[in-house]
Amino acid sequence: MKRKLFLLLLLFVGQYSVFAQVISGQNGVRDKRPGYYLFKNATIHVDPTTTLDEAWLLIKDDKVEKVGKSFDIPKGTVVVDLKGKHIYPSFIDIYSDYGMPELKRGAGGRGNFYEMKFDSDKPGAYAWNQAVKPEVKASELFTVNAKAADEYRKIGFGAMVSHVKDGIVRGNSVLVALSSEKENKALLKSNVSSHYSFQKGLSTQTYPVSLMGSVALLRQTIYDADWYKKTKASTERNLSLEAFSDNLSLPSIFHGTSFHDALRIDKIGKEFGIKYIIKSGGDDYKRLDEIKALSTHLILPLNFPKALDVEDPIDADGVALADLKHWELAPANPARVAESGINFSFTASDLPLKAAFFTQLQAAIKAGLSKKDALSALTVNPAKVLQIDDQVGVIKSGLLANFLVTDKDIFEEKSKILENWVQGEKFVISDISATEIAGKYTTTIPGFK
């Protein structure tokens, strides 16, 4: 009897230990068989400087298992012949708000000059100004957005670093995968970077009302956080200042709208010993030597200006020469930045229509940007600058199985993304087996010459 009870107890404990490894819930039976896929005979772009011809890629579940040529494969592996196709690492966008709550403006603090509002509406032991919110943690707000994820996957992205784009001090970000998995699986890393800007955003308080006020508020917050940390909160608790000090250990990203902002941001950083990664306004070419001297990483937008309407002489007379010059020179900004030796990455966040991404990228390449620099700006550069290259950025054993299958060189005109694999999950973008029917044909009708 005791022996039977012991065996039953052992069986129960064994089952519990297995199920205890599973954290998130799932309806139905879990399939724990390893999912091996082998992609062979493809041109594999392991990273921007390494390309393997007629190579093999083996993945297991959500990770890369092996990259090379003609190696032994596990039993039960699904083999996919990709002869003539190309494989690239999926792209990374480190300046996104994917999966973040929609920002909605509340009443008050705007528009009526005579209604001055100085107190914060936010309850709790937080900063006195609503535009200062370092306590915001993107990982706690992240929810999978299927529609937005699909838009990004179609243009080659597999991972995003997201934060709430609101306020002068915006809190920290989260690294997420663009898979269809639940948040528990899609969330890859919390507390990736801290974020700042000169825009007060949705704050309903009157102050600040100018760029000068925004700079003053940020500087005062830095001084306050330093004082608060040194006094060890001897007088009162302030959760915002505590979070601000904690976030200083993270890579810091500052949103700028022009080269003027970039120079201004660096000046603030030097005052307090902070090296900011700068979200560029796309006009760095105007002061390239000064920007290069900052020795920082730039996040470049691809929202180049549309052609100006100058057909009507009256309309043309109202177009500023500076606007015409920027329209002509903006597509060359990435190439100029690369030629100067400035480290940079790209973001698609400023594009109203995400489908225009490759059109804009092609414009940058035609203006002189090399394919190597373009791929670096979408893969290894963003991964390294935010220290997430242990998970994404290249096709390497142990990293996430985030990769693209394309019909040819991805930076050639009219190239197609056929599949985007994210965390080992296949997303079909274009039918890989579709027959190409474009070409010149001769029609023959019986009885006619």
Residue ranges with predicted function:
Residues R33, N41, K104, G111-G124, ...:
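His/Asp/Glu-enriched, well-ordered alpha-helical/loop segment
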